Regions:
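Active-site anion-handling motifs in enzyme catalytic cores
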Residues: 1-136
Length: 136
C-alpha cells in the first residue's frame, strides 16, 4: 500500500468483493516490521505494489498481483505468484475467479521459487564477499 495514494483503488476493489467475508484492506501507514508481521499472518495477498508482493513472497504468503508495470509482471513470474490481470483491463468476474482459485490452492510453486531465489541470493552474497577479500 502506498499510503494514502492507494486508498481509492482499495475502495474500488472492496466494492467488487463486498459480499465476501474475511477480506481486509490495510488503510493506515505501517513501518517495514509491522508490514511484514501483518503480511505474515495473511492467508492470501492481492496487491499491486512491488514491495507488498515481495513481502508476501518472503513471508511465504500466496500472492496475487494486479499489474500496473512490467516490473510487477517480472517479479510475479520469477516468484511463482499469480498475475490476476492488468490494472488497465481487469474485470470484476476475472478478479473474483482468480481469488477463489488461489484461495483453494497452496503456493507450492511460489515457495519453491522463493527457495531458489534465496539460494541464488546467498551465492551472490558469498561471491561478493570473496571479491572484496580479493579471492576471485
Amino acid at each position: 500500500l502506498q499510503y494514502p495514494a492507494d486508498l481509492k483503488s482499495c475502495a474500488a476493489v472492496n466494492s467488487f468483493l463486498k459480499d465476501e467475508k474475511d477480506i481486509y484492506f490495510l488503510d493506515s501507514a505501517y513501518n517495514t516490521e509491522e508490514f511484514l508481521s501483518l503480511i505474515g499472518n495473511f492467508k492470501l495477498l492481492l496487491g499491486m505494489r512491488l514491495h507488498a508482493l515481495v513481502f508476501a513472497a518472503v513471508m511465504k504468503v500466496p500472492l496475487l498481483a494486479i499489474s500496473y508495470d512490467p516490473k510487477v509482471d517480472a517479479f510475479v513470474n520469477t516468484a511463482g505468484g499469480v498475475l490476476a490481470g492488468s490494472v488497465d483491463d481487469i474485470k470484476k468476474e476475472q478478479l473474483v475467479n482468480v481469488l477463489k482459485a488461489a484461495w483453494c490452492k497452496p503456493p507450492v510453486v511460489q515457495n519453491e521459487r522463493m527457495e531458489q531465489l534465496r539460494s541464488k541470493a546467498q551465492l551472490n552474497l558469498e561471491r561478493t564477499f570473496a571479491l572484496l577479500r580479493g579471492e576471485e
